[in-house]
Amino acid sequence: MISNAAISKVLRQIAYLIELEETKDNHEDNKNKVNTVFKIRAYRRTADVIENLSSNVEKIYNKWKLKGLTEIPSVGKAIALKIEEYITTGNIEYFGELKKRTPINVEEFYHLEGIGIGPRSVKALHDRLRIKNLAELEKAAAEGKIHSVPGFSYKKEESILRKIQSLKKDRGRYLLGDIYPLVKQIEVCLSNIKDVKKAIAVGSFRRMKETVGDIDYLVLSDAPEIVMDYFASMPEVDEVIGKGPSKTFVKLNNGMDADLLVVPKESFGSALQYFTGSKEHGVALRKIAISKGLHLNEWGIYDSNNNKMVAGSKEEDVYNILGLEWIPPEMRENNGEIELAKKERTGDGNKLKLPDLIDYNSLKGDLQVHSNDTDGMLSIQDIASAAKEKFELEYIAITDHTKSLALAHGLDEGRLLDQVNKISELNDILKNHFKYNNNNNKNKKDSSSSNSFRILSGAEVNILKDGSLDISNNVLDKLDVVGAAIHSNFSQPVEVQTNRLIKAAQNPNVDIIFHPTGRIINKREGYPVNIEKLINDAKDTGTVLEVDAHYNRLDLKDEYIRMAVQNGVKLVIDSDAHHSMHFAFLVFGIGQARRGWAKQSNILNTFSVEKMLNSLK
């Protein structure tokens, strides 16, 4: 079965190739240029939608054919036909024709867009230096040839080298959000086998790392042969690499390697700990075991004197016999969690404690949501309805982009105030709707304020080059929630960039700094920021820092979250939703917050709407 990520990737490459061709044809008339721009946007928008779609596109096609594809948001008939062709044949003729017309390896180059190397830049490099692939680009950059091309600087040359090294390092690793639905789907299918008692995806996936190399499934069953046969024949499996009595290796349809191991009941807990990792965490546990006269491996904990198993069936028992509290998987990186988990008291008589991490079901609201007033895909009413009905949130803030972000059709002061009035009217409609429902609810005990829902007015205000904002303070003062973010001038020095953020944070109307470092995982490193200085200023000014839960951002990084928590800086976890399906990304933000040791009390949008608003500046 073809993954959504594979379809999205092809559509992005088609858009890239169209733009590459457009840069060659300087004689194209204005009408055709406009059509080409819209065509490029259509392919990219469709790629975004499909990449974030919770349902598998091939399954939609198998059930509803072309009609099902055209009912996916933003998918027009022309692109739907291309998707149909890809699903049914594995190829797109138009894509092949585009590739034949250029010597440039688009599959390699389109990863560089995050550092500002788009089709126009790639064409310039090819025209001047005949560069056709990443290997040739790396060689030219290492030899100092890139900065000789008009439009390229020494700084850009260095940036290219860093990006290529990063791509090499991350080669074969997948974004957590790209593979999460597939991994969970397989996990559920395995769990539903009659002879399976437990099935868990372990490794870095269980630890909610932002990228994952491969997938390991651990299964508790007394019928390993049945499990092996089932796993090897799943439609999600592309190729069986190896199959034994209790372990099978496969390649999934998305190109990812996956292993499945069946273990007996007496060893399941020990295997769960061992294969969850991290490697460093496991090494530290084995050292503790040795110090206690024990031997720890994936099959259990044994007394070193007589080799008798003393624990292994439950993961909690493995930790307990080592004198430790059970440690949440997200914390298992050997960064101090083991010291906190020790049951004995410290020298001063105090007992260190593991933090009570934020729960995966604890978010009550989402404070970065976009509507089709700018670059979102749904109306305010539609995305609010989905937030309540499908994701059971109690409030959202509509934080559309503002005027200096022309690409997103950002709001000026007038349109922003119009939106505030629209939100007020929608809240009145919602209030009457819930009042009516409560009056008609036979079970009065269930007709509490939990049925209410509130839309907050807000904005994602653009931080300009000098740190000022692109919306006046007298308008910002009328909003419920103000987030500020950098969307341009990424290459300024670290001192300038940090001061830019700090100046925005010091504005009394700015409640939250959105995606504080601006990174796009595997695409853009983000702008340089003195994060320690920003965190200290956030503490002094009472400014909240955001954990952007979109899986290609996860900004803040986990180590920065931990730093913020240690300094008493409040955080929010937001989906950065541009469509209702994006609320599903909140799970990745929570996972990231847990990796940063955040408690529920550290995250403001675990609070009720009134308590959250009162906790802002």
What are these regions (language model features)?
Residues 208-292, 298-371, 380-394, 403, ...:
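Charged catalytic cores and adjacent phosphate/nucleic-acid-binding surfaces used
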Residues 377:
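Positively charged, glycine-rich low-complexity segments
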